[in-house]
Amino acid sequence: MILRENITGLLHEWSEGDDAALERLTPLVYDELRRLAASYLKTERADHTLQATALVHEAYLDVREMRQYSWQNRAHFVGVMANLMRRILVDYARRHNAEKRSGDNVKVPLSQAELSVSVKPNVDLVELDQVLERFSVEHPRRAKIVELKFFGGLTIDEIAEVFSQDTDKITTATIERDWRFARAWLHSEMTSV
């Protein structure tokens, strides 16, 4: 527990203006973030040029702009970093698709089994991002759960920990129900396209 308390303390120090706190935090979460980035990149095409280390570093460049964010704990930070990495990959995919201009892209539907803890092969990240944007308008809490679980790789208990700091505290049972609902909704949306 000391490690988690240290991470939470460093996040609070950083949000209060201590830029060196982020530097001290980095080695404590870097391996976890790198593993997460590597799992994302396993789903990318063979000629993908972005490496896991570069993806983590790009996300760190973005998170530096969020210093005054109300950081809650390690799970919250990892979830935000996962979201940043997702956005980087979506932007990368959009640029790649724009460069192709060949129109021969094959859409591969997302099966319900594929919507699990981490990004799976054959998921069209641009399409998934668009569907998640629509979902978040109608179901913001459930969309946050999807981001934390699907992209952040957090467990139900870790997601509850993130929400425990919010005004919108929810139980693990509610998170599980919301996760089942979100999976079904996203599956329906992505297979109907």
Residue ranges, per PLM feature:
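Sigma70-family region 2
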Residues: 12-16, 39-46, 58-76
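Σ70-family region 2.3-2.4 aromatic/basic alpha-helix that recognizes the −10 promoter
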Residues: 30, 34, 53-61, 74-95
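Helix-turn-helix DNA-binding module
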Residues: 152-174
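Short, Lys/Arg-enriched C-terminal cap helix and immediately downstream tail that follows
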Residues: 180-193
